[in-house]
Design a protein with these regions (language model features):
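Conserved, mostly hydrophobic/aromatic
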Residues: 19, 66, 127, 140, ...
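Glycine-rich, proline-tolerant flexible connector loops at the mouths of alpha/beta enzymes
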Residues: 3, 35, 151-154, 275-286
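An alpha-helical appendage that flanks or caps ligand/catalytic pockets
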Residues: 52-118, 155-269
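A conserved active-site cap/scaffold subdomain adjacent to cofactor or substrate pockets
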Residues: 130-156, 160-161
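Short, acidic/polar
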Residues: 15, 131-138, 255-262
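Structural preference for beta-strand elements that scaffold enzyme active sites
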Residues: 26-30, 126-128, 146-148, 179-183, ...
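Glycine-rich anion/phosphate-binding loops
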Residues: 4-21, 250-258
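Short glycine/threonine-rich loop-to-helix capping motif typified by GTGT followed
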Residues: 190-195, 282-292
């Protein structure tokens, strides 16, 4: 997964295409705009999250260039942030015969560039955009992208899934089933007992969510129309019990199976990504959790 606004689009497209070739066409590309301002301003000043509209324009243009690089033998681009090739650059080399495919043969000025190799998958690997708000969800559907969602409750996710389904159905002129093109990320820790899961991982996930919610608040954790009591500090309500009932796959194998089945029955969930190595988790405990998930959850 890449925060594409932080990267040169031609370099990123080339790296992904090469990886797709090396993996024999098994790459799936995750993309996002970024959520942390201190990263954005240091990686690419044009991606500064203080200007969300500009950040989105950069995101859109970057993705456009990547798709051109993957799908066109030679391509050019002139946009707000990038121009390819660089204007007025001439090229002459005895071992590189001039071609009208990419060169003005009268002036030797390069008119187009290319990325080699192209991806193994054609026209390009599947693209998954991390989304949250309705506008981003609709944009992804309208532009042929799959989506990745993370925190919301089942009730809140239902609305998001429906927005994506409706926009994708309209864009593709077909009845898209609920759940198609959506992948859900859930924080997961499996243990022998509910108490052990909380003891080994509870405070670590709370600490991590406090980090995330410092910027985002608790809104993404709430059901539609839910109102929380006022507190002195915005994160006073954020504890294990608050999180567990809303969006955690923390508990016994049986409990986790039941929660996944709920996601399938309510959302027709087709793609689940589990996040199990969040900050603070003991490595052995994490690996034990993954083994329990593999042995006692996946088969059911």
């Amino acid at each position: 997964c890449n925060v594409i606004t932080f990267h040169n689009p031609v370099r990123l497209a080339e790296d992904i295409a090469l990886l797709d070739q090396l993996s024999n066409g098994r790459v799936e590309v995750g993309i996002g705009r970024g959520i942390y301002g201190r990263e954005a301003i240091n990686m690419n000043k044009e991606a500064d999250l203080k200007d969300q509209a500009k950040n989105f324009r950069l995101f859109e243009e970057t993705l456009t260039i990547m798709k051109k690089a993957w799908t066109e033998k030679f391509f050019s681009h002139k946009g707000e942030f990038y121009t390819y090739p660089t204007p007025n650059f001439t090229w002459q080399h005895d071992m590189s015969p001039p071609s009208e495919d990419f060169l003005d043969t009268k002036t030797n000025e390069i008119k187009k560039i290319s990325v080699v190799p192209k991806p193994k998958q054609q026209p390009h690997p599947p693209i998954w955009q991390v989304v949250d708000g309705a506008r981003s969800i609709e944009w992804a559907a309208q532009n042929g992208l799959n989506t990745i969602m993370w925190i919301p409750t089942v009730k809140a996710l239902k609305t998001r899934f429906e927005i994506y389904r409706d926009a994708k159905s309209k864009a593709e002129n077909r009845d898209v089933p609920l759940g198609e093109g959506v992948s859900l990320v859930r924080d997961m820790f499996v243990a022998e007992t509910m108490e052990e899961a909380e003891k080994l991982a509870g405070q670590h996930i709370v600490n991590y969510m406090k980090w995330v919610c410092h910027w985002r608040g608790l809104g993404n954790h709430m059901d539609p129309g839910e109102e929380l009591p006022e507190t002195k500090h915005k994160l006073d309500l954020l504890n294990y019990d608050f999180l567990h009932k809303r969006n955690l796959l923390f508990g016994t194998p049986e409990y986790v199976v039941n929660k996944i089945n709920e996601l399938k029955s309510e959302l027709n969930l087709q793609n689940l990504q589990v996040w199990s190595n969040f900050p603070g988790i003991d490595h052995k405990a994490c690996m034990r959790s993954i083994k329990l998930f593999n042995d006692e959850v996946i088969p059911k």
